[in-house]
Amino acid sequence: MNLHGNRLSVLLCWRFGLLGLVGAALVVGSTGCSNSSTLTPVTSNDAGTAELDAVPETDSGTETDSRLELKSEASPARELPKYSYGIVEQLARSSSRQTVAEFKSTLASLNKIHDHPLYTMIYEGDYEIQPEKLFRASQAASTPDFGCSLFYQYQEGQSVFGRNFDWELHPAMVLFTHPPGRFASVSMVDTAYLGFSLDDLEAFDSKTQQRACVEATQIPLDGMNEHGLTIGVAVVPATQIKDDPEVPNAHALHMVRLILDTAKNVAEAKSIFERYDVVFTGAPHVHFLLGDAMGQSMVVEIGNGDTSYLLNDATVAGAKNWQSATNFHLRDEENPVGQCPRFARLKETLSATDPVDLKPMELLSKVGNATTQWSAVYYPGQGQVDVVMGRDYEHPLKFDLNEKANFGQPRLGTEK
């Protein structure tokens, strides 16, 4: 479906059930995930994905023998694009804990909605967060010289989170998830991490190759959950990271997933970060910007053998009502190294503009460049996100996390 050039609102319909923090079933660390013995192995193909025909044809949502597993020898047939960080070939088993019906429904929801390739997918069912060893760099120690821009602003109960993803052109995905017992969220995914490329969009239509899409849960680059907690990452220069053998490791992108799935606010997110040593195996070093619906924000930086938490509470009298991050470390607030014009522009605008008057997408357009693949504006208090692909700021796509009717069925309409 070609929707490029039309001014559209994409309202993703969502459901909510009983919610709670993830329990012991979600395990992240150097030892991997638990309960693998309960899963039934299935055959694998040369794309490194599960052979659906080998799985019992049942729609049961509770039978463990209907869930999916990948064999450890699985590997993709196609070469990964430059600067991608493929995970499919590294999986000892799929992160999916779906029934066959959920697996089929998830792939059936995959839909291309923009010619600057953007897909939507609604993941049904459960998944595990996999350990950091799953990532492998296709271009070891090599990072493109691109930049990203993130900001958060809050005033009088209204918060906004903006993000430019500046990188090589790859197919992108808006992913909706709601794993049992955890929080619903919307997130943005660069599908190059799954081995997809601009030169092979037909792979999304291949029943064999598209199955890698179920691993998209593992690699969000920015997103927001139902409580309004929002998070994004930006590349920074590599520095020494913590290496405590007594502390479990978690990959940076898995931390994004953990936060979206299990934290309601910045304080809870900080407590999750404190439980892990964040690693960047097979991917560039990044720092994190987080903001919630209550005026709290935080920049998290890993480097110099430690983790820094730069906290801001916009509800405190005299405190600034914004934070931002680009592509240099902020932990030395008096003299941050490597400041860029984008950060200066964000600082100037956010310091001088009342949130009521702020035009967040316009600000992102001013700090974007030719490599800006998507611009996303999240509204934590409303559960909404606007996405612009390829700097097409005249035609934003609007997604709504709060619509509850007709779960799993996107509906298109005029912009609100």
What are the roles of these predicted feature ranges?
Residues 232, 238-365, 369-372:
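A surface/extracellular/periplasmic glyco- and lipid-processing/surface-interacting theme
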Residues 14-29:
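Bacterial N-terminal signal peptides
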Residues 10-11, 30, 145, 210:
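Mature extracytoplasmic/luminal segments of secretory-pathway proteins
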Residues 33-73:
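Ser/Thr-rich, Pro/Gly/Ala-heavy low-complexity intrinsically disordered linkers and tails
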Residues 2-4, 43-44, 51, 57, ...:
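Intrinsically disordered, low-complexity peptide-like regions
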Residues 1-14:
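N-terminal secretory signal peptides that target proteins for export/translocation
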Residues 35, 67-263, 278, 352-416:
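N-terminal mature-domain region immediately after signal-peptide cleavage
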